[in-house]
């Protein structure tokens, strides 16, 4: 009488588990990078959208429009080039370039997550002229995440108000983000 046994040996089972583990690890890495790419793209798109709104609002109102980094919707973060927590945009009715109760806020973007955004050195706010013209000098926003310099991108606004996405210069550093 022939006794056929069906099944796997312990060695075969362990080999299959090891292969599944390796494949899962590779898939997770790609998935994680895709999620970080999407978050960085979203932050860059929201920033570009606010720049466009500011130009339109300043032209429509005939007043200066200001965009500044902000932790909440109530005030600019004075002297900061860190836009990672978000920003506000408003029509500056009294010309002091700070958000006051009399000013008309038209955008508030709150960011969470692993994207770190910094503006060019010394650029703590963006002020659009009453005719909708941009501030008059180049401005670069650098967007970094937990992957560091290798995956950083920039949003560059030229003197004409046109913006483009690119890779940061070689000397640009990204903070360590956990």
Language model feature labels by segment:
Residues 2-3, 22, 26-60, 64-178:
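N-terminal helix-rich module
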Residues 1-24:
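Glycine-centered recognition micro-motifs in short, flexible terminal segments and loops
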